[in-house]
A protein has these predicted regions:
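Helix-enriched interaction subdomains in cytosolic or periplasmic regions
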Residues: 1-17
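Glycine-rich, highly charged phosphate/nucleotide-binding loops
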Residues: 20-26, 76-91, 97-107
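Alpha-helix C-terminal capping/helix-to-coil transition sites in glycosyltransferase folds
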Residues: 36, 91-92
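Conserved beta-strand elements of the Class I
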Residues: 41-43
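NAD(P)-binding Rossmann-fold cofactor-contacting core
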Residues: 46, 50, 57-78
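Structural motif
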Residues: 94-95, 120
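ADP-ribose/adenylate-binding Rossmann-like module
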Residues: 112-136
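A charged, well-structured terminal subsegment
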Residues: 152-173
Length: 173
């Protein structure tokens, strides 16, 4: 399993420090969670390409994630059938990525926590649902709040590229 070296950990720690949530997993755990998230249900995914709720999932899809749009007001997003609710996502998912206002996010966290595959629950930057997150954590689920998946993914991608560059330089490539 790939682990973070001090350089990678520092880059990710800078992004993690932007979150107001003090109970998020540490950098090593975040790294493992992001690496295992391939099938991602995006609750609140937007049809509007200018919104973060569309840009972030688009980026993840471009990086190889299977993004499943969840939006009751859309038929298709990014060429995929949108599901009206998280309950309508019948296939297993590794992560539920939430783009809903904080006052509505708790219900989504509770729904995600009830899924049999026990997905990672990730509330995007600016979104918190402390009580629901605590309930999910009590069930042993990984919950991340108030943290931008794009920024984390980019930090990990950037550090991977730097590691590759350092390796190439060491080999004399």
């Amino acid at each position: 399993m790939q682990t973070l070296d001090d350089y990678d950990r520092e880059a990710l720690a800078r992004v993690l420090s932007e979150s107001s949530a003090t109970d998020n997993p540490d950098a090593d755990r975040i790294h493992r969670l992001v690496r295992r998230a391939i099938d991602i249900a995006v609750v609140g995914m937007s049809r509007d390409p200018s919104k973060a709720a569309r840009r972030v999932p688009s980026y993840l899809a471009a990086k190889g994630a299977n993004v499943i749009p969840v939006n009751p007001h859309a038929d298709r997003i990014l060429g995929k059938d949108a599901r009206p609710t998280l309950a309508d996502v019948t296939e297993p998912v590794d992560m539920v990525l939430v783009f809903r206002p904080s006052e509505l996010a708790g219900a989504v966290v509770d729904q995600a926590a009830g899924r049999p595959e026990r997905p990672i629950i990730w509330l995007q930057e600016g979104i918190r649902a402390d009580e629901a997150a605590a309930r999910a954590r009590e069930q042993g689920l990984d919950v991340v709040q108030d943290l931008c998946m794009y920024k984390v993914h980019r930090a990990l991608g950037d550090t991977r590229r730097r590691v590759e560059e350092r390796g190439a330089a060491a080999r004399g490539d």
